[in-house]
């Protein structure tokens, strides 16, 4: 499986940092932010800025859903339940999930909602992104430690590591 489309839910520092990075390498048509209709309207009216550059992100509400190959959760933990519901129309038979919320609770919630076969575990380290209003700044993106709960190497891990290799996103597999 090759990951060609990425949906990101959560427009905090990590969501914007990874979204901007991936959008520049894969194109705005292939990387989009997922949000409820109210947030989409708000996001479209005030463009995000990342390290001084306007992002020009693409946004999709559930009414505008397309199947994503990978969905990245970058919401605060208290927003996970709502996010799990919001992404539902974007989920297909082969959609993979990655959460950049450190700790394993979010992955367990995704597994419960969509099945363990679709979830990779991740921990972001070494980044220094911060957000103030609609501006995100960072000097160091750090890296993502990624893998399966049982430390196996399977097709879903291969698909995501190939994506990271293709885009140059720093990662480690334990």
Model-identified regions with their sequence ranges:
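NAD(P)+-binding Rossmann beta1-loop-alpha1 motif at the extreme N-terminus of oxidoreductases
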Residues: 1-57
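A structural micro-motif
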Residues: 4, 29, 95, 117-118, ...
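A structural signal for isolated positions on well-ordered beta-strands in alpha/beta enzyme cores
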Residues: 7, 31-32, 98, 145, ...
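Flavin (primarily FAD) cofactor-binding/catalytic cores of flavoenzymes
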Residues: 9, 13, 87, 156
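Short, charged/polar "capping" segments at the starts of alpha-helices
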Residues: 39-42, 107-108, 153-154
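Rossmann-like NAD(P)(H) cofactor-binding subdomain of soluble oxidoreductases
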Residues: 52-135
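Internal alpha-helical scaffold of NAD(P)-dependent oxidoreductase catalytic cores
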Residues: 90, 116-118, 133-174
């Amino acid at each position: 499986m090759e990951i060609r489309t990425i949906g990101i839910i959560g427009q905090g520092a990590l969501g914007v940092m990874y979204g901007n990075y991936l959008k520049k390498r894969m194109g705005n048509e292939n990387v989009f932010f997922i949000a409820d209709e109210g947030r989409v309207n708000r996001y479209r009216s005030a463009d995000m800025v990342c390290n001084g550059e306007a992002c020009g992100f693409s946004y999709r509400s559930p009414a505008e859903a397309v199947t994503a190959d990978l969905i990245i959760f970058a919401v605060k933990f208290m927003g996970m339940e709502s996010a799990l519901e919001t992404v539902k129309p974007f989920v297909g038979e082969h959609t993979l999930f990655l959460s950049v919320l450190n700790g394993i609770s979010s992955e367990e919630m995704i597994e419960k909602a969509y099945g363990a076969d679709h979830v990779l575990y991740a921990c972001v380290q070494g980044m220094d992104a911060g957000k103030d209003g609609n501006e995100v700044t960072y000097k160091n993106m750090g890296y993502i430690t990624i893998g399966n709960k049982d430390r196996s190497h399977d097709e879903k891990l291969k698909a995501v590591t190939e994506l990271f290799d293709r885009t140059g996103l720093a990662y480690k597999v334990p």
